[in-house]
């Protein structure tokens, strides 16, 4: 933790580059490597942690969940994803991903990733959509290849908070070091958002010290969504929340068991219930919730009786991804062959790699803001991306950035940006009804940073404010406490109370840079909460059980065979309904 200093002891570093990549996770690393290998453009990767162990792959994975085999085609994958999402997907985006997932898988293997093979040398698959790997080192492999690029600079431990723009073009971003008392102004001709989704909006399964034992990285706080929302970028399908079905307490993946040993979902009476409710992702969780509501819980994956060899495989598989599950089995003295594995749903997340919430982008991953691109979990419209889909989007965005810079479509050289460059700062979004803030200068962003060091002690600490936010979302916006159900009255209460917390967040006090980081993570989550609530109110149906369980409208409604999009404008989140995309229509063109 950095040494406590006075609010005036800050340095400002200004950086000029061709491409700024915000987020050094899966998509960000792959995009940086691609631009580095295939162009002369200078790239800066801004990462809040360290790219070697950051993002969703930090601890590793034991499978690549998007790999097409068994004679299936990319079109089959699109159909699978569309069916799972009840039709609310972008076919055009999904197809561009599905056409690349096998190619990027083979590229990962060339980089050194161990993909399991059978005696004939073929990949060991789980069904037709994924392959087994030894993936503990997958993120270090990606990071290593980024560092090999001579024209790529990685800045670790920097938190980006606000986009910078000139006129209608995004021209960089502002941020601060999470270790040293340093502020950053980064000027760029192109900016790629690759910050992942949003965790920590809702109260999690485990309390207290274990509250970060969750499915999605707790450090993915929705920063990429938030800075885009504040800047006026169009968002899509945020209401399509994701809830994961997980092993109880450890929050370890269940797919490894369900697909690896064919385990069925079982209630406390020994009845297999999954066929009763359906087997899409949300239906599996819906069935578990309904069985518990009916008094037939706890619920399990039926593993009792599997072979010792299969049990050993599960031990090893979880050591590659969620070692706490293996440790729990060992500590209890009973492995999965002796005892069924209890399951539960997590709190909801906003994540564009599993469901479809995120930036509204074209097929080349341009957002609606000129000069701004999106890839990975932060990009909307294309669920079921997983690791390889994020890599594919990183490459697609990288190719687009290179092509756009080659065309030099009106962008100035990075060293010639005007001094009167505008931004939207965190301070602009103080309540959902306020008037739209005007453009600000860099001093406004840095003033906001310094302001938190000058604040006196407030009623709530940052941690208490975060807990208040999670309690509000849990109880009024469809969290675990309400079995994921919500209604309009509750959403209105949530919106009002979250807006109050937004105001309070501006008064929070920081004693060091880590405190400042936590304050801005809270601010970003609050911004995402407000947008999420607006989307949930706008879809007046239950399109997806659990993911969007609207108690006022418990059935699907063909009227909502459309996308719910939004733009933050004139001080409020304005909802836009867009028709479903099958090709590349006029609705995709940038404003």
Residue ranges and their predicted role:
Residues 407-422, 426-512:
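Long, amphipathic alpha-helical stalk/connector segments used for oligomerization, subunit docking
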Residues 1-19, 37-40:
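Extreme N-terminal leader/targeting segments of oxidoreductases
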Residues 19-45:
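N-terminal Rossmann-like FAD-binding beta1-loop-alpha1 element of flavoenzymes
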Residues 110-161, 237-386, 391, 477-591:
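Mobile, glycine/GP-rich and aromatic-enriched active-site lid/loop segments adjacent to catalytic centers
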Residues 49-76, 255-257:
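Conserved N-terminal glycine-rich FAD pyrophosphate-binding loop of Rossmann-like flavoproteins
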Residues 164-184, 191:
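Conserved beta-strand-loop-beta-strand element in the redox core of flavoprotein oxidoreductases
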Residues 193-252, 387-400:
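Glycine-rich loop(s) and the adjacent beta-strand/alpha-helix scaffold that form part
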Residues 15-17, 180-190, 368:
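Core beta-strand elements of the Rossmann-like FAD/NAD(P) dinucleotide-binding domain
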């Amino acid at each position: 933790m950095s040494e406590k200093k006075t609010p005036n002891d800050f340095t400002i570093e200004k950086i000029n580059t061709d491409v700024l990549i915000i987020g050094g996770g899966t998509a960000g690393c792959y995009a940086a490597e691609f631009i580095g290998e295939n162009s002369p453009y200078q790239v800066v990767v801004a990462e809040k942690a360290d790219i070697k162990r950051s993002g969703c792959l930090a601890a590793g994975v034991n499978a690549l969940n998007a790999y097409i085999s068994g004679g299936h085609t990319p079109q089959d994958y699109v159909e699978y994803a569309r069916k799972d999402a009840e039709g609310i997907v972008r076919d055009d985006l999904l197809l561009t991903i599905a056409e690349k997932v096998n190619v990027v898988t083979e590229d990962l293997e060339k980089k050194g990733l161990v993909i399991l093979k059978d005696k004939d040398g073929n990949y060991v698959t789980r069904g037709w959509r994924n392959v087994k790997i030894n993936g503990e080192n997958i993120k270090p492999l990606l990071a290593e290849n980024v560092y090999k690029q001579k024209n790529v600079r990685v800045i670790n431990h920097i938190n980006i908070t606000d986009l910078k723009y000139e006129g209608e073009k995004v021209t960089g971003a502002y941020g601060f070091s999470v270790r040293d008392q340093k502020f950053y102004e980064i000027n760029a001709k192109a900016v790629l958002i690759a910050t992942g989704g949003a965790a920590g909006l809702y109260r999690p399964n485990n309390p207290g010290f274990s509250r970060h034992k969750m499915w999605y990285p707790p450090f993915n706080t929705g920063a990429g969504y938030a800075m885009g929302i504040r800047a006026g970028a169009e968002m899509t399908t945020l209401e399509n929340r994701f809830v994961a079905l997980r092993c109880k307490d450890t929050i370890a993946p269940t797919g490894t068991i369900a697909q690896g040993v064919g385990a069925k979902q079982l209630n406390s009476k020994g009845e297999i219930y999954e066929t009763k409710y359906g087997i899409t992702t949300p239906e599996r969780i819906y069935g578990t919730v309904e069985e518990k509501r009916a008094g037939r819980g706890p619920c399990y994956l039926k593993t009792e009786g599997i072979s010792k060899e299969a049990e050993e495989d599960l031990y090893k598989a979880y050591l590659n991804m969620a070692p706490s599950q293996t440790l729990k089995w060992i500590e209890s003295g009973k492995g999965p062959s002796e005892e069924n594995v209890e399951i539960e749903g997590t709190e909801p997340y906003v994540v564009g790699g599993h469901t479809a919430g995120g930036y509204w982008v074209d097929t080349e991953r341009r957002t609606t803001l000129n000069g701004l691109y999106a890839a990975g979990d932060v990009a909307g419209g294309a669920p079921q991306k997983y690791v390889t889909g994020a890599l594919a989007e990183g490459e697609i965005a990288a190719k687009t950035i290179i092509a756009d810079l080659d065309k030099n479509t009106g962008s100035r050289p990075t060293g010639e940006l005007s001094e009167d460059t505008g931004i939207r700062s965190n301070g602009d979004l103080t309540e959902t009804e306020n008037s739209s803030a005007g453009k600000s200068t860099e001093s406004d962003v840095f003033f906001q940073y310094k302001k938190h060091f000058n604040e006196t002690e407030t009623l709530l600490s940052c941690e208490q404010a975060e807990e208040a936010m999670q309690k509000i979302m849990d109880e009024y916006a469809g969290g675990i406490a309400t079995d994921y159900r919500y209604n309009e009255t509750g959403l209105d209460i949530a919106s009002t109370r979250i807006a109050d917390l937004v105001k309070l967040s501006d008064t929070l006090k920081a004693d060091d840079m880590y405190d400042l980081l936590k304050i801005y993570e809270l601010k970003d989550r609050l911004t995402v909460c407000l947008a999420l609530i607006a989307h949930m109110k706008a879809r007046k149906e239950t399109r997806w059980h659990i993911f969007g369980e609207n108690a006022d409208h418990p059935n699907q409604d063909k009227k909502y065979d459309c996308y719910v999009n939004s733009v933050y404008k004139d001080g409020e989140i304005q909802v836009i309904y867009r028709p479903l995309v099958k090709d590349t229509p006029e609705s995709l063109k940038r404003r």
